[in-house]
Structure formats: structure tokens, C-alpha cells
Amino acid sequence: MRTFIAIDVNEEVKKQASEIIEKLMKRGFGATWVSEENMHLTLFFLGEVDEQKISEIAEHLCRRVRGFPSFSFTVKGFGYFKRKMSPRVFWLGVENTDRLMKLYEELRNELSHHGFSFEEKFVPHITIGRVKYYPDKWEKLIEDIDFPPIEVAVDRFKIYSSTLTPTGPIYKVLYECQFEGGLIRYA
């Protein structure tokens, strides 16, 4: 099954993100927009992993971060990744904190023991849309879009499965790892 590890964002972030999506749609942008219930900060995309292995990975990851201190990060700003001269992905910025990087590094180190490698630099962000089409002079149309700073408290991460459908992905929580509470299985 397709799997990824993520941190959920709060309702305030989801509401503000939906308002930005609405603006972009009204301005002529077409995208596969991320629904509020699917908004998250991806830590790792693991790809296809069988159920037995993901269970083992979840246990090891959770053990690795048991007692990790709770922390927060700030979602702030709006941006995009480009392909050539075209917008490819719209995102909300995440201010990188030492604790977020430490969590990422702990999980990455544990995942490396399970055969995963991640060469790309970690650029924390929250994807809100994968752009399909855009209007002429699109850069001018997004100059005024911004995202006010919103703090997100973190005391856990989740492991999700992702099923691709023609109407967009369906995410299902498989495991939740609470820093102080241990592993919860949903599968």
C-alpha cells in the first residue's frame, strides 16, 4: 500500500487554507485542490510498503521518539514550486524549528535501518493544490495572497495509507504515534 508519515494541522490552518484555495479558483487557477480533511505536513513519503513491514516500521518509529518533547511550528506564507515557468504546486510555508528538524532526523535515521533513503532536502510545507492550468499573467494574480502566521502544536505523528482515485487521493490513518502515549493502531 502507498504510505506516508505526516503531522496533522489544526482547524484554523485548514480554514485559512480553504479561503486561499477559494481565491485561487475565482482567479482562474485549476488544480487538484487538497480538501481540508487531507491537509497535513508530510515528513516522509514511503511509497509502496506491505502491511507487515509498515506495522514493524510503526513500532520502531514510535519507540524511537517515545518521550520526545512536544513542540510547535508556525504555518506562515504562501508560495509555489515551479516547473520551467509554470506553477506546479501551491503550498503554505512552515517555519522550520529545531524540534521539527530533530523529529525529522530521528525518523529518517530509524527509516534508514529499514532500507529507506531520502536524498532530497527536507523543505517543510503544506501542499494545498497541484496545478493543472493557470491564467495568463498568473504571477500578478497571486502577489497579494498571503497566509497569516498560525501556530500548530505537535505531540504526535501519523502513518497514512493513500489510495489514488480519479477524484483525488483517499487517506486513511493506519498508525498514530503519540510522543507520550505510544502507538495506536487504526488498521
Swiss-Prot record:
NCBIfam families: 2_5_ligase
Catalytic function, reaction form: a 3'-end 2',3'-cyclophospho-ribonucleotide-RNA + H2O = a 3'-end 2'-phospho-ribonucleotide-RNA + H(+)
Listed name of the protein: RNA 2',3'-cyclic phosphodiesterase
Upper taxonomic lineage: Bacteria, Thermotogati, Thermotogota, Thermotogae, Thermotogales
The protein's Enzyme Commission number: 3.1.4.58
Classification via PANTHER family: RNA 2',3'-CYCLIC PHOSPHODIESTERASE
HAMAP family in the record: RNA_CPDase
Family note: Belongs to the 2H phosphoesterase superfamily. ThpR family.
Record GO terms (molecular function): 2',3'-cyclic-nucleotide 3'-phosphodiesterase activity; protein kinase A regulatory subunit binding; RNA 2',3'-cyclic 3'-phosphodiesterase activity
Keyword NAD carried by entry: no
Signal peptide: none
